[in-house]
């Protein structure tokens, strides 16, 4: 009976728990369909015999674990492929430690302790072994040694191949034996490095002359005696500008083209000498050589002083007729010599007022004294003649310049006012030996008697007026009489104030309209 009661109680509790769980799930679904916001919190404390929290779902965890296993393996492989693992990156409880004394199996912790004491790294040498093999070394030093070995291998491999570049060594005949030996050592080093060497013998630059090819070849073979074991790649050649040969080291093998030939086996006579291009014949070009000049001097006839004749040159203009441009000009006589009995045609005048046979000379052409003077043209509209007058002809009297001037009076360059009661002063003579009223007997001594003054250059200019270049004042109207002093009548009173005995009669000092009179 007791057992039955226990079973009924447990069954009733289980049934009640199932009913309450179904009820809550239906309420949640109904609230979601009607879009009603209700917060229902189900807790395991409210449902003591609930199995929701006690049953973990491992299905999704197992699926995630299966998906990431392949990815983790790839990452580990990438890390391991970079290089050996060091120190703490080594996995495993035990390792086989290799040293100079031998090898033994120790724990990983013991191997790390030993590496730390020696200040080195614990490097995993073989990972696939069980247990993995490790070694205590300095990892940075091992990397340096490995890189150095790689460089040496690359250098040795490069030294086995010939380089395409060509190095050149040049020397001149004035080089000494020790310098020639030094250059040969340089050539050997270059050939061992894989270069082909071009040996060039050239003449001295300071002498500026070319040597014979045989001398340059002799100098070249003196140099090649120091490198006799070298292979000849290009056969020796020589000319007046230099001798050249190209050699290479024997360890690189013979060249592809041509046979094997050592430098020491080559004879100097077998070298090729370039022929010079023929020079143009100097006799055909019109240039005489030294031998030709000697022959000319020997064959040249020698004349005595009596037989000497002047050298005649051919006149290129003897048979040429002058053009019409020079037929009537002043240069016609330069091209056509005329005999004294030959009739001369009148020349065409170059100007409108020129005589038929008159030669134009320059700016001023003198005229004969019997020719009448041309009409004067004033320079300016209101211009009067200047004070200086040079008579053109002896019989022509000068004209007065001013209305009150005497006929024979000479005007000066300045104005002298005269008063009515003053006597007119006699005119001053221009020359020291001339009387006051004496007329000049001839033209000015500075002028030629047969020459006439130049024609006026301006429209209103007088015939003999000289333009001065500066303005000269003209005389105004008749001068006024000087002012007479004022006379004061005896009964006339003055408006002046009497001055004090101690004061002067001058104007009183003040400051104009702003000054105030002083009151006593």
UniProtKB/Swiss-Prot annotation:
Q: Where is the transit peptide?
A: 1-66
Family, similarity comment: Belongs to the IF-3 family.
- SUPFAM superfamilies linked: Translation initiation factor IF3, C-terminal domain (SSF55200), Translation initiation factor IF3, N-terminal domain (SSF54364)
For this record, an example GO cellular component is: mitochondrion
Q: Which Gene3D superfamilies match?
A: Translation initiation factor 3 (IF-3), C-terminal domain, Translation initiation factor 3 (IF-3), N-terminal domain
Which residues, by range, are in coiled-coil regions? none
Q: What is its biological role?
A: IF-3 binds to the 30S ribosomal subunit and shifts the equilibrium between 70S ribosomes and their 50S and 30S subunits in favor of the free subunits, thus enhancing the availability of 30S subunits on which protein synthesis initiation begins.
Fill in the subunit field for this protein: Monomer.
Quote the biased-composition stretches of kind Polar residues, using this chain's numbering: 336-361, 404-422, 458-468
Q: Where is the composition biased (Basic and acidic residues)?
A: 271-282
- Entry keyword annotation includes Ribosomal protein: no
Query: This chain belongs to which protein, by name?
Result: Translation initiation factor IF3-1, mitochondrial
UniProt keywords (A-Z) are: Initiation factor, Mitochondrion, Protein biosynthesis, Transit peptide
Q: Which coarse location class describes where this protein primarily resides?
A: mitochondrion
Under PANTHER family, the record lists: TRANSLATION INITIATION FACTOR IF-3, TRANSLATION INITIATION FACTOR IF3-1, MITOCHONDRIAL
Q: Name one GO molecular function term.
A: translation initiation factor activity
Compositionally biased residues, Pro residues:
369-379, 473-485
Q: Could you tell me the superkingdom of the organism this chain comes from?
A: Eukaryota
Q: Name one Pfam family in it.
A: IF3_N
Record's subcellular location: Mitochondrion
Protein's gene: IF3-1
NCBIfam families from the xrefs? infC (TIGR00168)
Q: Which organism is it from?
A: Arabidopsis thaliana
InterPro entries for this protein: T_IF-3_C_sf, T_IF-3_N_sf, Translation_initiation_fac_3, Translation_initiation_fac_3_N
Name the segments for region: Disordered.
271-520
